[in-house]
């Protein structure tokens, strides 16, 4: 018997694209009774998800952040995720360039970044390379260093997803397809929360508007919305990497909040040292969680984000727009 595993040499390659347009959702804040509340719509929040996540992963949290900060929140799909194009390369310099291009296309001249895991490293790099674009940032459980010690985690993610595609081969017509996929992934991922997050990208029919040169829905089998086979190496090597050459000598002096999981290995002593060096204007919040902070401590991390952005939002605001300031004008708009 020959193995069912597809040989890498026979795989169809992804196209090479320097930048790709990022799919997004925009969550607007609820209207305030105070018409002139400084919502800073010119400085929205851009939320970047983790590996194999999507703009839909934490949709409710993003809406809460929009309401809690009176600020629009863009949730985006990173390349090779969700509704965004499948293309290489997948290195951090390219992913940060995608963020810059997204802001340019949307006409955003100053943004606040929130990044989790993979998205955290992208956010840190974007702040370092494009400080004129990034007003401030919240970095959730990651550090600006190479992390070979987390390669095992990435390998398990990829193995579990490949197992569904190449071994389980679940038909799209199977009514219990998602539970069967979860059961198949248990061999590599006993953690149900992680499986649930990865399964968000698993579908039994082609979504409207979805296009990929390598994901084939004509086979009659359930598919991930990620090009898993083509990303097998990148998801391990590129995700755990950090671009030391392109960031040499760079520092970001804007305010940055780091949220660290006390049970997570992602921010170690080396990472802490590097953070202090290149992000001198940093604050830390420790939460009693593993790396899965967004699932284990959702209310806590959302509050940390809102408190941080609210504390820094008025640094450049006119005094008559700041609630509590002696010059604040209490004009109330009752059209809510």
UniProtKB/Swiss-Prot annotation:
<dbReference type="InterPro" id="IPR000073">
    <property type="entry name" value="AB_hydrolase_1"/>
</dbReference>
<feature type="active site" description="Charge relay system">
    <location>
        <position position="117"/>
    </location>
</feature>
<dbReference type="GO" id="GO:0005739">
    <property type="term" value="C:mitochondrion"/>
</dbReference>
<comment type="similarity">
    <text>Belongs to the AB hydrolase superfamily.</text>
</comment>
<protein>
    <recommendedName>
        <fullName>Ethanol acetyltransferase 1</fullName>
        <ecNumber>2.3.1.268</ecNumber>
        <ecNumber>3.1.2.1</ecNumber>
        <ecNumber>3.1.1.-</ecNumber>
    </recommendedName>
</protein>
<keyword id="KW-0496">Mitochondrion</keyword>
<keyword id="KW-0378">Hydrolase</keyword>
<comment type="function">
    <text>Alcohol acetyltransferase that catalyzes the synthesis of ethyl acetate from ethanol and acetyl-CoA. Can also function as a thioesterase by hydrolyzing acetyl-CoA in the absence of ethanol, as well as esterase hydrolyzing ethyl acetate.</text>
</comment>
<feature type="transit peptide" description="Mitochondrion">
    <location>
        <begin position="1"/>
        <end position="14"/>
    </location>
</feature>
<feature type="domain" description="AB hydrolase-1">
    <location>
        <begin position="44"/>
        <end position="296"/>
    </location>
</feature>
<feature type="active site" description="Charge relay system">
    <location>
        <position position="291"/>
    </location>
</feature>
<dbReference type="InterPro" id="IPR029058">
    <property type="entry name" value="AB_hydrolase_fold"/>
</dbReference>
<keyword id="KW-0808">Transferase</keyword>
<keyword id="KW-0809">Transit peptide</keyword>
<dbReference type="Pfam" id="PF00561">
    <property type="entry name" value="Abhydrolase_1"/>
</dbReference>
<dbReference type="GO" id="GO:0052689">
    <property type="term" value="F:carboxylic ester hydrolase activity"/>
</dbReference>
<dbReference type="GO" id="GO:0016740">
    <property type="term" value="F:transferase activity"/>
</dbReference>
<dbReference type="GO" id="GO:0003986">
    <property type="term" value="F:acetyl-CoA hydrolase activity"/>
</dbReference>
<feature type="active site" description="Charge relay system">
    <location>
        <position position="141"/>
    </location>
</feature>
